[in-house]
Amino acid sequence: WIMGHMVNKIEQINEFLDLGANSIEVDITFDNLGYAEYTYHGFPCDCKRWCTNQENVKEYLNALSDITTPGNPKFRKELTLVVFDLKTGGIDANRMYEGGKDFAGKILFDYWKGSENAGRAYIIISVPSIDHYKFMKGFRERFDGSAFKDLLLEKDGWDFSGNDDLDATRTAYQNAGIEALNHIWQSDGITNCIPRGLGRVNKAVSNRDSPDAFINKVYVWTVEKYSSVKDALNADVDGIMTNHPNVINGVLKEDEFKDRFKLATYGDNPWTKFKR
């Protein structure tokens, strides 16, 4: 998966898809009560990126639904996976669970349109700290007893993006009521302004491939330097988050990688561990 980074304006969705992305990441900000407000990153952000692009969350989700609904004139088949990078740090601790429930409602009614026939992309609920596991718990439990629980079970995955200890991350999922290998993506990364080694990535990949795994997939962020892309692919990651999807596409076409990797399509399940 080539994951377009910080796609916070509606018009940027097609821009990143045109560059070769098959996945996007969008930042979501909240008020202190846990209500989602804007698609906004703010300062600091990646080098050579505009940090203040934003949309109203409802308007963005509606547009995203159009782009990922077959039969809609705006449909783009390339977009198969959306990462919601949830800026939960400003939510009051005692409102984290309710914030998760409220955002689940926005996904259900603004993105899925309260229907099984809209917004076909898979989604990842990405939270920046394992201390915020109650947000995931609230999101998941919003669907308990719901007619749309099957949508959650089919379409939704999880990620803690704060580079936390992997054993502690496993425990956080247990606290959230999410079982091992239940659609879990593990991210690792840092802003493109600063180099970062692959030590933790290698540990995550080892977990993914072990009999005692809790991780289904591994992705790195934010990567665009040619040598760093090659290093990430040689580490056997499943996804690369980038500001320059065209760079990743170019590397994938090289002799070293063209027979080892392919660009994921909608037919490739993002929750299934890939075995060579």
Curated annotation (Swiss-Prot):
Note accompanying the cofactor annotation: Binds 1 Mg(2+) ion per subunit.
Organism listed in the record: Loxosceles laeta
EC code: 4.6.1.-
Location(s), subcellular: Secreted
Disulfides per UniProt: C45-C51, C47-C193
A GO cellular-component term linked to this record: extracellular region
Top-tier EC class: lyase
Name of the protein in its database record: Dermonecrotic toxin LlSicTox-alphaIV1i
Names of required cofactors: Mg(2+)
Protein family: Belongs to the arthropod phospholipase D family. Class II subfamily.
Alphabetical GO biological process terms: killing of cells of another organism; lipid catabolic process
Catalyzed reactions: an N-(acyl)-sphingosylphosphocholine = an N-(acyl)-sphingosyl-1,3-cyclic phosphate + choline; an N-(acyl)-sphingosylphosphoethanolamine = an N-(acyl)-sphingosyl-1,3-cyclic phosphate + ethanolamine; a 1-acyl-sn-glycero-3-phosphocholine = a 1-acyl-sn-glycero-2,3-cyclic phosphate + choline; a 1-acyl-sn-glycero-3-phosphoethanolamine = a 1-acyl-sn-glycero-2,3-cyclic phosphate + ethanolamine
Keyword annotations: Cytolysis, Dermonecrotic toxin, Disulfide bond, Hemolysis, Lipid degradation, Lipid metabolism, Lyase, Magnesium, Metal-binding, Secreted, Toxin
InterPro entries reported for this sequence: PLC-like_Pdiesterase_TIM-brl
Primary location recorded for the protein, binned into one broad class: secreted
Single annotated GO MF: toxin activity
